Amino acid sequence: MHRRDFIALMGLGIGGAAVPSIFGKAVAAEQLLGALDVAFKKRLADAALNAATAAGCSYCDVRVGRYLRQFIITRDAHIENVVNTESTGVGIRVLAGGAWGFAATNELTPEGVATAARQAAAIAKANSKSQTSPVQLAPTPGLGEVSWKTPIKKNSMEVPLKEKADLLLDVNAAALAAGANFVNSLLFLVNEQKYFASTDGSYIDQDVHRIWAPLTITAIDKATGKFRTRDGLSAPMGLGFEYLDGDKSQKFVSPNGVVNYGMSYDMKEDAVAAARQAREKLSAPSVKPGKYDLVLDPSHTWLTIHESVGHPLELDRVLGYEANYAGTSFATMDKREARFQYGSPLVNLTADKVAPGSLGGVGYDDEGVKTKKWDLVRDGKLVDYQTIRDQAHIVGKKESDGCCYADSWSSVQFQRMANVSLEAGKSKLSVADMIKDVENGIYIIGDGSFSIDQQRYNAQFGGQLFYEIKQGKITRMLEDVAYQMRTPEFWAGCTAICDQSDYRLGGSFFDGKGQPSQSSAVSHGSSTARFNGINVINTARSLG
C-alpha cells in the first residue's frame, strides 16, 4: 500500500477501521511497550533450526518478529482514530533439494515452531520436484550473537498518548487560525523487534524504529468553490520521537523563504506556512506549457529517484521475476555490461542500508547479511543493481548486497529497495547560486501525484509548491505544473547539484511490492538539483 493510498483511505474515513486487519490485532497502548526476552527467542529459533536440519534441509533461517504500530489520526479539532496494533510470530525459510520452502506460526512454543519448520521442509521438498535449477545462495559468514538498534533518543511508543494527541490538535488549531479551512494530521509510529537465526551460525537481535508525521491543509475560495491543498514537508524517518522536537539547526530555508526540514521537523511551523501557501495557490497563475529548466528540492526529488532509479535497478525487476506489481525494468543486464549512460557525468546514485536516520537503515537484513553502501550509477554510467543472496551469482557477485526484507514474520523475505540516493555535488553550490544561472525555469518543492510506465522509462511528476524563475530570480508562484520525462534523458539533463550542506532525506513509509503485497519503508537523499530542458505540461487543461 502506497502512502498516498493510505492517506486517501483516511480522507474517506475508512482507513482507521482497516488498520488492524492490515497490520495485526488491535491492542491497548500499554502493550506496545517492552520486548520478548532474547533467550526465549533463541530457544524458539534453535527449535526450528534443529527440526529443519533433522528433516534434511541444507539451510534454514528463522525470524522471530514482534511488530508494533500506532496510528493517531486527526481532523480539525477532533481525534478521528487511535489504533495500536501488535503482531508476533515466527517465520521459517528452508532449502531442501535445491528449492525454497516457507512456513509461519504464531504458536510461540518450541513444539509449535518445530512443527512449522517441518512444514517448511515438506513444502521445499515438494517444490524441488518442479525446480529447473537449484537455488544458489551466496555465502555469508556466521556472526554469532550480535545486536543492532536504531539510534533513537526518544522511543515513540513510550511517549504518552495524550502528549501525541495534544501535539496534533495544537498543530491543527494553529493551521486553522492561519486561514486553513480543513486540516488532517497524523502520526504513524513503528517499532519492529526482529530476531534472526540461521544454520550459518548467526543470532541477530534488532530493534528498528520509524516515524512519520504527515499533514494536509485545505484552503477554499467560498465564492467560487475552488480549493487547493498543501501537504506537509516532513519526511518519514528512521528516528524516534525526537524528530518532532523542531531543532532549528535542521531547518533549510529556500531563497524565497519556504522552510524545509532535515533530521528534525517543526510540525506546527510547517502547518501554519502550509495554510498560507494553500491560500496563495488559489490565486496563483496557471503554468504555460513548454520546456523549462527545473530546480528540484530534495522534498520533491526523492520520489523521482524512487520511481526512476530505485525500482528499475531492483534485480528481480530487471530479470522479469517481479512484473505484476508495477512492472519490470528498462535497465536490462546488457545495459549494465555496456555501462549504459543513465545520466550526466554529474550523476552518482548509490544504494545503502546504513544511512543515519533513514527508513531502510538497519544493521543486518532479513537474510542475516551485514548491511553496506554500494554504487548503482557512477559518473552517469550504470554499474550495478540491488541483489540478495540467491541472486548474487546471476550478476557475478560473491556476496549479497544485504537488501532482503519481509514486512512481517508471516511473510517470506525477498529483495526490496535499499535507500537509493543522489550524491551531493562536489563543488560548493547553494540553492540561491544555482537559481542565479536559470533564465527560464521552475522551482519545485514537495512531492505530488505521479505516473510511470511498466518499464520505469516514461513518467510524469507533480509537486506541492511551484515557483517561476526568470533571469535568475524567483518571481511568483505557479499552479497546475507537472513535468514529463524519459528516465535516461531526464538524468542526462542534470547540470548542477548543490553541495552536501543542502543534503536531505525524503522517502516512502508504505512502498508496495510483491504478490501477496508487502510494504516496506525506504529513504532517498539528495541535495537540490537542476535539470535542463524538461517538458512541463499544464494539468488543468483538457483535450479537445
Predicted regions and their residues:
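N-terminal small-residue-enriched
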Residues: 2-544
